[in-house]
Structure formats: structure tokens, C-alpha cells
Amino acid sequence: MTQNDFRKEKDSLGELNVPASALYGVQTQRAVDNFPISGLHPWRAFVWSIAAVKRAAALVNFELGLFNDREVDGKHFTAKQLAESIAQAAEEVMDGKWNDQFVVDPFQAGAGTSHNMNANEVIAHLAAAAGGEHDPVLRLIGGTAGERRLHLAPDGLAVVGVEQGVEIRV
């Protein structure tokens, strides 16, 4: 790959090169670089479940009035636009259109924080595609209000279990 095949993105830890065609961002790239364990990508059912949780959180939180109209970087987002764009983007992920954008190793350490950021970055990028920038939406979804990053992996796995017809005991 040449330098033109990358874009520079910055977070609180510094700047990294991210593939120019990637829908994910710097935090996902950092996880890929830091956790090169198996070389595998997350399983399709897990990606589907993460997107299902993100979609549900966006729609329910809109209904509960937890999303507000926001002005970010000169762009106006109504609460309804925000919720609908996140839900639509999550549906595209659920349909399997963007499986190649989920690149965090399934065996990475932790409670799923890197998988959560991978999902947030991809969904935010898709949700804001018409505007050309994903940063404003990413800052607005911030965990999709009420859906915590440490709960995403267990919630997602529970959704997979239900979807696959597995009995879940608590």
C-alpha cells in the first residue's frame, strides 16, 4: 500500500494511519495494531448482534427523549434524524453489507471495548455518509446513550444465543 492508500486520524493517544477505504477509524486501527492475536475477524453472528443492540438503543433512546437536536461542526442534526440514521446504518451492518469493516480480533483482551468502538466508528461513518464526515455523528452517538461499552459483548452474545435458539440461564 502506498501513502495515498491511508488517511491520518488522531485520537487522545496520537495519530495513526487508517486505510483510506475503511469505515472504521483510529480507535479500531489501534486495537488491530495492539491485539494481533489470531488473525481472525469477529463472527458474522456477533457482528449482527452488536448492530442489533446499537439499532435498538438508538430507537428506544429516541422514544424516551434521550436524543436532542444537536449542532456539531456547523451541521444541524434533529434527534429524529440522528436516531433514524444510526438505526439505518445498523440495519446495513445487520444485513451483512459491511462485515469486512469489523476487523478487531475476536480474541482480543478486555470486555469488548474495542469491538464497541469498531461498531461505533463504522455505524457513525455510515450514518453520516451523506455529510461526508463521521466525526460529528460519532461524537453524538457516544455509546448510543444508555448502552454501555462493557455491556455490549455480553448483550451481543445473549442476542446471538436467543437468535440461534440457545437456552440462556442466568
Predicted regions and their residues:
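N-terminal low-complexity segments that are often proline-rich with Ser/Thr-Pro
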Residues: 134-170
